[in-house]
């Protein structure tokens, strides 16, 4: 079943949401990110095709299945349904990006939609491009992934014991994966399929937070600064069609025109053909350039 949906409004809280402490440098997060970037640079000097191929495959698994199809379109917006085992699988894939656990990720993104480019938005470029891209991650509490705090904004996931466990141990799948990569291909494999793949995926997601609220076209007259950015869409499995998404947040399809390449939508359609995806919400857009006021 595919359900057509029109432009949507998300209610905005009258009070700014204070989610995380913004004071002080988060040294743990900062050191980890610096080390990952050093590893990504080192990978360029230890290239081999096997490690590169594994990195590309894991990028699809982690960022494509885990973030775009999982954390974002499934867990956060519930734009389609899959069997519970597949929902769990997508969540585990999402942790491989080092973007946090599922409860944390969905909470942050739901708040972003509720307060998009307004006071309380966790990562708005109105506070600076650097802040929106990565700055908001580098400050505040030592433990960003506070399950109890995030449960307020992701109560549906917080009711599930598996999601609570995964949120508290979101680092574990990457530790296991790093060990496997070392056994399979040594240091080059760890640097490419680990460090380089993670860093590239982080920046792809961060560009959705920063670039797609600064550069690109606006098909819909949303109340925020969201844009459709083709080059961000290319590296993020269709997440760059961000203005479309903010106008229709529960649509499983983000690329609404034939020329807006949206790999995640194609994969969701494939799951439907295989009988694994149902209750799919799709934005119904009569005119490609119609302006509509939405979330």
Regions found by a protein language model. Give the residues of each.
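Non-catalytic, topology-defining segments of multipass membrane proteins
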Residues: 1-206, 211, 251-295
């Amino acid at each position: 079943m595919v359900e057509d949906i029109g432009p949507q409004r998300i209610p905005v809280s009258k009070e700014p949401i204070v989610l995380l402490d913004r004071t002080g440098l988060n040294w743990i997060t900062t050191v980890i990110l610096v080390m990952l970037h050093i590893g990504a640079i080192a990978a360029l000097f230890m290239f081999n095709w096997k490690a590169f191929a594994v990195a590309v495959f894991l990028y699809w698994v982690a960022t494509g299945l885990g973030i775009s199809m999982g954390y974002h379109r499934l867990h956060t917006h519930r734009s389609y349904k899959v069997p519970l085992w597949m929902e769990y699988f997508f969540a585990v894939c999402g942790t491989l990006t080092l973007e946090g656990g599922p409860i944390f990720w969905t909470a942050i993104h739901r708040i972003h939609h509720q307060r998009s480019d307004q006071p309380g938005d966790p990562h708005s470029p109105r506070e600076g491009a650097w802040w929106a891209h990565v700055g908001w991650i580098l400050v505040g509490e030592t433990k960003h992934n506070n399950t109890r705090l995030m449960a307020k904004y992701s109560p549906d996931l917080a009711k599930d014991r598996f999601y609570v466990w995964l949120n508290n141990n979101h680092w574990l799948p990457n530790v296991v994966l790093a060990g496997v990569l070392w056994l399979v291909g040594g240091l080059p494999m760890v640097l490419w399929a680990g460090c380089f793949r993670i860093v590239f995926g982080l920046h792809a997601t961060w560009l959705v937070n920063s670039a797609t609220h600064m550069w690109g076209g606006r098909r819909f007259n949303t109340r925020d600064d969201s844009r459709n950015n083709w080059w961000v869409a290319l590296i993020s499995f269709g997440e760059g069609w961000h203005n479309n998404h903010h106008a229709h947040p529960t649509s499983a399809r983000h690329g609404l025109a034939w020329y807006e390449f949206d790999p995640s939508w194609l994969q969701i359609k494939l799951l439907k053909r295989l009988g694994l995806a149902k209750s799919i919400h799709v934005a119904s857009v009569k005119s490609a350039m119609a302006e509509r006021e939405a979330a």
